[in-house]
């Protein structure tokens, strides 16, 4: 671990003195592929909607649902750094993310469900990204305020992990793969250890300030120490009181899960995040339900992409969260969030960008994701030509 330290006062002064330009990446010298992706995102904004999907399990059943229903798969693929440190074994997704981007040329977005120990004296005992005040089975008392106090074991832990993630992202840069990078998501909520510790709708100034310092620490180390050039930064703070300097992110994200699923435009939420993010493009960085393109365009709630969560948000499951299979042994759409007719209509809409619609996608090679390729070959045989 390097002795590099972030000078917060100097960094904030430097950032605030710089004009905000939503048209330009905050990375001063991005890789050519990163710049190309940025220009493409800008060309879509307000006119088209890029389809996305978050993944967890290695079999990636979500693809089977999309492919068998529509003959297409989403253009953006969401993966997670949650398993990078070894505290949450079995959740390492980096190899899959790298393989998918290399094979298909699809767009990657990466979040970080950051597992942290409950007991710094016995870090293997219990870890979680959920804070101790939640009702989840696994949770942590890892303290965001102590995290930002130099000399504490919590501080040393996060600096080590930040640099570990930077090394992984450098691997993507060396492979010429840009990443839509979304750390410290949903920070206004009190369910993650890095977030606001107050009750819903309120704010705890101490934890809010610590969160902002943690954001600036990640930004500073990635940008100025590790000099990563392949990132498009997505800020997902979810409230104006959590806002960080606009010169530290390129796109603003909002995560929306309604108690009753609906396909409305989410105009109120779109307007809300637009009001405090300085003209940055706005995206639906996580969702339970995909909005209707007609409604988004009618209302002017032109989310750049959408990203349904994994598992039962896409395919039907039983009471033990196992996929319910159809007569062909394949997972089927979950009608609670999107039935077969809705999925077909959305993925055939010319305003919706799927993987094959990306301008650099090679339609001759048809490089399906590996897990989907293997499952289809096993089920239908070589005669399909897949």
Language model regions located:
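N-terminal regions that are enriched for targeting/export leaders
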Residues: 2-82
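Aromatic- and acid-rich polysaccharide-binding/catalytic face
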Residues: 239-261, 309
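Catalytic domains of carbohydrate-active enzymes, especially glycoside hydrolases
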Residues: 58-87, 92-112
């Amino acid at each position: 671990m390097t002795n590099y330290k972030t000078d917060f006062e100097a960094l904030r002064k430097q950032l605030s003195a710089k004009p905000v330009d939503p048209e330009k990446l905050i990375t001063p010298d991005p890789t050519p592929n990163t710049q190309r992706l940025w220009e493409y995102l800008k060309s879509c904004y307000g006119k088209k909607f890029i389809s996305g999907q978050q993944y967890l399990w290695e079999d990636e059943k979500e693809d089977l649902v999309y492919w068998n229903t529509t003959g297409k798969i989403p253009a953006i693929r969401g993966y997670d750094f949650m398993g990078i440190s070894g505290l949450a074994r079995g959740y390492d997704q980096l190899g899959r993310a790298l393989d998918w981007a290399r094979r298909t040329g699809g767009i990657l977005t990466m979040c970080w469900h950051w597992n942290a120990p409950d007991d710094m004296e016995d870090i293997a005992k219990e870890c979680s990204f959920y804070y101790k005040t939640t009702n989840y089975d696994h949770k942590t008392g890892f303290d965001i305020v102590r995290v930002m106090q130099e000399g504490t074991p919590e501080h040393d832990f996060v600096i080590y992990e930040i640099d570990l993630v930077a090394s992984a992202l450098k691997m993507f840069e060396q492979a010429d793969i840009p990443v839509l990078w979304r750390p410290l998501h949903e920070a206004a909520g009190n369910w993650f250890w890095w977030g606001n510790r107050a009750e819903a709708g309120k704010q705890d100034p101490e934890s809010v300030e610590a969160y902002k310092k943690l954001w600036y620490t990640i930004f500073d180390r990635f940008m100025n120490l590790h000099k990563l050039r392949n990132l498009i930064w997505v800020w997902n703070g979810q409230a104006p009181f959590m806002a960080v300097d606009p010169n530290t992110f390129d796109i603003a994200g909002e995560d929306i899960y309604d108690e009753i699923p609906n396909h409305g435009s989410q105009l109120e939420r779109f307007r809300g995040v637009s009001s405090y993010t300085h003209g940055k493009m706005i995206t639906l960085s996580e969702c339970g339900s995909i909005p209707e393109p007609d409604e988004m365009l009618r209302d002017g709630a032109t989310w750049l992409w959408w990203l349904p969560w994994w598992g039962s948000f896409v395919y039907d499951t039983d009471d033990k969260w196992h996929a319910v299979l159809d007569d062909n042994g394949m997972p089927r759409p979950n009608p609670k969030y999107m039935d077969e007719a809705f999925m077909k209509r959305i993925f055939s809409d010319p305003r919706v960008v799927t993987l094959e619609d990306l301008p650099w996608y090679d339609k001759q090679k048809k490089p399906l994701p590996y897990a989907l390729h293997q499952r289809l070959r096993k089920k239908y045989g070589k005669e399909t030509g897949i």
